[in-house]
UniProtKB/Swiss-Prot annotation:
FMN binds at residues 93-98, 140-143, 176-185. It comes from Vibrio parahaemolyticus serotype O3:K6 (strain RIMD 2210633). Residues 258-472 form the FAD-binding FR-type domain. PROSITE patterns: FAD_FR (PS51384), FLAVODOXIN_LIKE (PS50902). The lineage of its organism: Bacteria, Pseudomonadati, Pseudomonadota, Gammaproteobacteria, Vibrionales. Binds 1 FAD per subunit. Binds 1 FMN per subunit. The keyword Repeat does not apply. This is Sulfite reductase [NADPH] flavoprotein alpha-component. NADP(+) binds at S543, R544, K549, V550, Y551, V552, Q553, D585. Residues 87-225 form the Flavodoxin-like domain. The gene is cysJ.
Length: 623
């Protein structure tokens, strides 16, 4: 089904470090009154506040015209006679986790006085590795073992014949992933392998971090920076200058993943029909006074609480009353409270199943644990409460939390533009619900937002910026958007933004779902945008409205000639939604379009589409 435009069917800060490098001490530029005032203020701050304030001062210093005459500049001049040794940090990130770890590493390196540069993998030229002495790569893994979109080019370069010998390079790799997937931390493992093959030396063992990565990543960063300081000093490549506390880098916002903003739920409205098999909610959250800003393509992180009833059900399965206490981050909590607010109690994982098989003695689970594929399939389709139901087992409170991962926030693609909604943020949330042995099962975050959180209630949120899913800078550039189901969310943001910017570029949307009458999300809005001309074209695919199922990839192929023409006209392509099937099918459809309409062999068509990704003209936000 297709719709065209306008139609619709004070001391010397270095006096204790004089032995480090033999540099002259850096004199304090503060008078006694300034220094005493600073000391009094600093003494009242927490460590988190100190980190923020130090970065704030550093940011101010960087923008002062007289910065060249500051003690930092003097310190730099004192070591400039020697070759500049530095640490280069490269992040390969899809959703922002690896970027966050890399930014934390950068801040910590600066606080240690280490010269450091931070690069998005898409902005780093692989050949420059031959000029580096110390590199740390922070890499997440996308989909089924694929490199994140921003790292595809670097990942391919290191496998190519053009990759240089790296015998002078020392490196470290921190890999992020989810052990529920077969190719756990694959991208990080790849980078480790490729660098070693090119002759580089690892100065610290690679760490493979699971979804609750924060503590492990923090410890690894500490150890890695210690080794970097040792090797930089021993190699005499550069002297480590211990900078004043004010030189630590600033965080981008007062509110972040570790320090979320307590916002208010304004609206939770079901936008699927009463006879739909889905419950999809339009969520509006008030950010007034937070100072939080976002761009189209960004995500909102939501810290949610688990169902109290589910926590009680789990406790009953393992013989606990709920009043037993556990220690979580130095805080003593009842086990029931801990399950509600601190631990993941919905989604299972292979490690949990294997450990419970051992504790319970369940023959069924022990047999599953011997087959990785079957174990992975079972854990993906069985919630924790149902794993524990396999065999009644008495656990202590500490044994129970030893099986569980820490609770992590859920990221949702933002469905609004601040140019349109100001200090609000909108989401499109599909409630995850299904039956298991005649029992209703729900997703943790989606049921919190759609069922348990009432309008006017508090929700802790933060903005996760996504530089890998951004509108073209040139407003005349055409865009093609493919977003079935809740994958429509960022494109609502895109269209709102393009309308408010009076962007002249054409906009083409492919949307799909089950039925036209029950599942056409934001239907009235798309009608309005078609009528006004903001939306140039809309093609929809409702899979259950006819005998033969039709999906968005079929609509792309039906319009192959026009899609190819838009690509030739410079269009950017965006895909959002399911990674397991939809994204792959859409990718294959685009390759077929290039093959047929571009009159090129299949291999060349594949390369053409991959080149679009490298040029950031083909961007994906898939999950």
């Amino acid at each position: 089904m297709s719709f065209q435009k306008n139609e619709y069917s004070h001391k010397n800060v270095s006096e204790d470090n004089n032995g480090q490098g033999g540099n002259p001490p850096i004199a304090s530029p503060l008078n006694d009154q300034q220094f005493n005032s600073l000391q009094q203020t600093v003494s009242e701050l927490s460590s988190q506040q100190l980190a923020w304030v130090s970065g704030y001062f550093w940011g101010l210093a960087q923008h002062q015209p007289s910065a060249a005459a500051t003690p930092i500049a003097q310190a730099a001049a004192a070591v400039s006679a020697k070759p500049a040794g530095k640490l280069t940090i490269i992040f390969a990130s899809q959703t922002g986790n690896a970027k966050g770890v890399a930014e934390a590493l950068e801040q910590e390196a600066k606080a240690e006085g280490i010269a450091v540069e931070l690069f998005d993998a898409s902005d780093y030229k692989g050949k420059n590795l031959a000029k580096e002495t110390h590199v740390i790569i922070v890499a997440s893994t996308n989909g089924e073992g694929e490199a994140p979109d921003n790292a595809i080019e670097l990942h391919e370069f290191l496998q190519s014949k053009k990759a240089p010998k790296l015998s002078n390079l020392q490196y470290g790799v921190i890999a992020l992933g989810d052990s529920s997937y077969e190719f756990f931390c694959q991208t990080g493992k790849d980078f480790d392998t490729y660098l070693a093959k090119l002759g580089a030396t690892s100065f610290i063992e690679r760490i493979d971090c699971d979804v609750d990565y924060e503590a492990a990543a923090e410890e690894w960063r500490k150890n890695a920076l210690g080794k970097v300081k040792e090797t930089l000093s021993s190699g005499n490549e550069a002297e480590i200058v211990q900078l004043p506390v004010g030189q630590a880098a600033a965080s981008h916002s007062q509110y972040n993943k570790q320090n979320p903003y307590t916002a208010t739920l304004l609206t939770s409205q079901k936008i699927t029909g009463r006879d739909s098999g889905k419950d999809v909610r339009h969520i509006e959250i008030d950010l007034d006074g937070s100072g939080l800003t976002y761009q189209p393509g960004d995500a909102l992180g939501v810290w949610y609480e688990n169902s109290s009833e589910l926590a009680s059900d789990i406790l009953g399965k393992v013989g606990l009353s709920g009043v037993e206490t556990v220690d979580v981050d130095g805080e003593s909590l009842s086990i029931h409270s801990a399950l509600v607010s601190k631990f993941e109690i919905t989604t299972s994982n292979p490690q949990l199943v294997a450990k419970f098989a051992e504790l319970s003695g369940s023959k069924k689970l022990q047999k599953l644990a011997e087959d990785k594929d079957k174990l992975r399939e079972y854990s993906a389709n069985t919630q924790i409460v149902d794993v524990f139901a396999e065999k009644k087992t008495k656990l202590t409170a500490d044994e129970l939390v030893g099986l569980l991962r820490r609770l992590t926030p859920r990221l949702y693609s933002i469905a609004s533009s601040q140019a349109e909604v100001d200090e609000e943020v909108h989401l499109t949330v599909g409630l995850v619900e299904y039956d298991h042995n005649d029992e209703k099962r729900y997703g943790g975050a989606s049921s919190f937002l759609a069922q348990r959180l009432e309008e006017g209630g508090d929700v802790k949120v933060f903005v996760e910026h996504n530089n890998n899913f951004k509108l073209p800078e040139d407003d005349t550039t055409p865009i093609i958007m493919v977003g079935p189901g809740t994958g429509i969310a960022p494109f609502r943001s895109f269209i709102q933004e393009r309308e408010n910017r009076d962007a002249e570029g054409k906009n083409w949307l492919f949307f799909g779902d089950r039925t036209f009458t029950q599942d056409f999300l934001y239907q009235v809005e798309w009608q309005k945008y078609l009528k006004s001309g903001v939306l140039s074209r809309l093609d929809v695919a409702f899979s259950r409205d006819q005998v033969e199922k039709v999906y968005v990839q079929h609509r792309i192929l039906e319009n192959a000639a026009q899609v190819w023409q838009w690509i030739q006209d410079g269009a950017y392509i965006y895909v959002c939604g399911d990674a397991t099937r939809m994204a792959k099918d859409v990718h294959d459809a685009l390759v077929i379009v290039a093959e047929q309409e571009g009159k090129m062999p299949r291999d060349d068509a594949e390369q053409f589409i991959n080149d679009l990704r490298k040029a950031k003209r083909y961007q994906r936000d898939v999950y």
